[in-house]
Amino acid sequence: MTGQPLTMETAAGADAGTGAATHPADGRRPVVVVTGMSGGGLSTALKALEDLGYEAVDNLRLSLLTALVFQAHDRPLAIGIDSRTRDFSADALLQELDALRAHPDLRVRLLFMEATEEVLQRRYTETRRPHPLAVDRPVPDGIALERTLLVPLREAAEVVIDTSQLSIHDVRRLLTGHFRLDGDPSLHVFVTSFAYRHGVPREADLVFDVRFLDNPHWDPALRPLTGLDRPVAEHVGRDPDFPDFFRHLTTLLAPLLPRYAREGKHYLTIAIGCTGGRHRSVFTAHRLAGWLRDQGYKVGEGHRDLDRRHPAPEPAPPWREVASRETPEEHR
């Protein structure tokens, strides 16, 4: 979530999620315990879960967790417990969760929110607040101490979300995929393109690199277009390596996705990357999303870096200039 710190107030301005049935298809009552790094998006996560239909409680004392869960009766719960919480202990929280998971009527999951040290420091600088574990010391000291303290919880979490590169909309989309209450047990797939120069999406479950395909960037007529435009799509689709690659990709996914679903996974992110995130990856991601829909999956599609401003293009490599002079028709 670059650009602004995560707070309940900033999350309130995002599009609301869709609340639905109280229980998922298996009939168990959902309980989501939200923890993680201070500044990593805990408040935003609780607000998003509340919009999905959960009753949200923040900064609950650990000693009250079990009592609250059973006093809530039929309601799905989202409970924030983190290092600010009075009597907080990672080991004690894990013991409480194990005890709750022993109840057959509950589906208890641990959600861990985090971000990189650089992003966390920037968020604290923007809010001018001290770190809760380093009130009279530099913020980096508090971040390092908290990350060490929370290692057991991160390792035990069913869902880990790194918000470093995510917008609030992205976080809400991921939370909706993992924790929706519509009773639909099927696997939802989100396909996104991205630029390697801006980093691999941290939320991706599967990543595929299409930088081996011929790059439309070197054709001046195609450079300002995107992989959603027909001329670029035709250019990439004509690459002799594309048909075999796409066939192998779908052959891999065809048996893999049902296995994910059988293991209880409800949300899967597939990321397709190229250098600039505008041509090859966009076309391939769009093509893959269409194939997945044809297979009956519920599919979301995004293109992370499509509208990102890029630096001025570098000169074409010498071999590309020679080839262009000799066979200009191949690069129109």
UniProtKB/Swiss-Prot annotation:
GTP binds at residues 82-85. Belongs to the RapZ-like family. One of its GO terms (molecular function) is ATP binding. ATP binds at residues 36-43. It comes from the Bacteria. Residues 10-22 have a biased composition (Low complexity). This is Nucleotide-binding protein RC1_2868. Keywords: ATP-binding, GTP-binding, Nucleotide-binding. Residues 1-27, 302-332 are annotated as: Disordered. It holds the Pfam family RapZ-like_N. The keyword GTP-binding applies. InterPro entries: P-loop_NTPase, RapZ-like, RapZ-like_N, RapZ_C. It comes from Rhodospirillum centenum (strain ATCC 51521 / SW). Residues 302-312, 322-332 have a biased composition (Basic and acidic residues). Displays ATPase and GTPase activities. HAMAP family: RapZ_like.
